[in-house]
A protein has these predicted regions:
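N-terminal beta-strand motif that seeds the catalytic metal site of vicinal oxygen chelate
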Residues: 1-21, 70, 125-126
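Short glycine-enriched loop/turn motifs at secondary-structure junctions
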Residues: 6-9, 62-67, 104
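Vicinal oxygen chelate
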Residues: 20, 70-119
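Conserved active-site alpha-helix within GNAT-family acetyltransferase domains
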Residues: 21-30, 110
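Conserved acetyl-CoA-binding loop of GNAT-fold acetyltransferases
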Residues: 28-35, 88-90
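Conserved short beta-strand elements that form part of the metal-binding/catalytic scaffold
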Residues: 34-68, 119-124
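Acetyl-CoA-dependent GNAT
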Residues: 58, 97, 101, 124-126
């Protein structure tokens, strides 16, 4: 994961993972590069194009009770929705993917809930 953006200030979300192996499989299935970067295996970085998310080990997390989440604002939400849809996530339960919709707050967006219950919204301005 060389060449990370270091020429500007950015905020990077951190999400919990009960298992780095399962998180890696899930996010790789969406097209992310995923690398465990800590020697003891409790921290990882996933990247997809300019999107970056970090993961910390949280083995006692209950996915149905998780309040973790993040929002990615992207330039082409329809393209990313099509790519994520190829992972064949269900429309209900954990994990899942929601429909791509125009929202009253001026965004076209969808969401995924990952295997650890984190809500990841992805949107583009209308």
């Amino acid at each position: 994961m060389e060449g990370r953006m270091q020429d500007r200030d950015i905020a990077i979300p951190q999400l919990p993972a009960r298992s780095m192996e399962r998180a890696a499989a899930f996010y790789r299935g969406l097209g992310f590069d995923f690398e465990v970067v800590s020697p003891n295996g409790d921290y990882a970085i996933a990247e997809l194009g300019s999107l970056e998310v970090h993961f910390f080990l949280h083995q006692s997390l209950v996915p149905e009770q998780s309040s973790f989440g993040c929002y990615f604002r992207v330039g082409d939400v329809a393209q990313l929705y099509a790519a994520f849809s190829r992972a064949n996530l269900p429309g209900a339960g954990i994990p899942r993917i929601t429909a791509l919709e125009n929202k009253p707050w001026g965004m076209c967006e969808f969401a995924i809930i990952d295997e650890d219950g984190s809500l990841v919204r992805i949107g583009q301005e209308l």
